[in-house]
Amino acid sequence: MPSNSTDLPAPGETRQMFVDGPAGRLETLLAAPRQGAPAGICLVCHPHPLYGGAMSNKVVYALASSALQAGLLTARFNFRGVGQSEGVYDQTRGETGDALAVYAWLRRQLPQAPLVLAGFSFGAYVSLKAAAEARPALQISVSIPFGKYLENAEPPPHPGCPWLALHSADDEVVNYDDTLAVLQAYVPPPQLVRFEGAGHFYHGRLSELQQTLLPFLQQHLPA
């Protein structure tokens, strides 16, 4: 599909496209809710590019599916160097630019739509960094890795909107207590949902994850 197509997907349709990013084209999947005009837009960021992260990740898919169910147009995309996206890994700096490029494209299509920024693991950190410029209506962070891959990195600013954080107490990749300490330092802290026994990848718990996300979206988005 041509880069920067201005055609949004029809209701119930999923469409592949390419958005021009800072380092080249970014492979993007747009999905539209089945009924009516979108109530908003949701941009979902995937896990670490150097450890197999991609927009096909099942937690990323679960985030996007929850947003679709809430009536949002959803966008998943591959960071630079992943899948058909151009460029090379850039330690969250370039990836934040990638997220903002997709956000800017979405904003041009739907200038007034409320924005939900969401991400899993590395993608949760990148989406929180992007919030300073994108100014979302809602922020969702799943297993956000403060300091895990990001040595000497300062936590990003508070997104300035209702914020939901989800984390498993037995996360084998991103330590729960370390993340909790950082989250509790924010003013106000995010709403935190602690999972038990879900690990980092929420194996067998994705439906529970979605059941947690959907009420948050429905509560805070305009009817």
Cite the ranges covered by each PLM segment.
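Active-site nucleophile loop of the alpha/beta-hydrolase fold
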Residues: 47-48, 141-149, 168
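Short, surface-exposed "cap/lid" segments of acyl-processing enzymes
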Residues: 35-76
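Short alpha-helix in the alpha/beta-hydrolase fold that links the catalytic acid
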Residues: 175-184
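Short beta-strand/loop motif that positions the catalytic acidic residue
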Residues: 158-160, 165-167, 171
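Alpha/beta-hydrolase active-site loop
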Residues: 89-109
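N-terminal cap/lid segment of alpha/beta-hydrolase-fold proteins
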Residues: 1-37
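Catalytic histidine-centered segment of alpha/beta-hydrolase-like enzymes
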Residues: 198-207
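Gly/Ala-rich beta-loop-alpha elbow adjacent to hydrolase catalytic centers
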Residues: 118-127
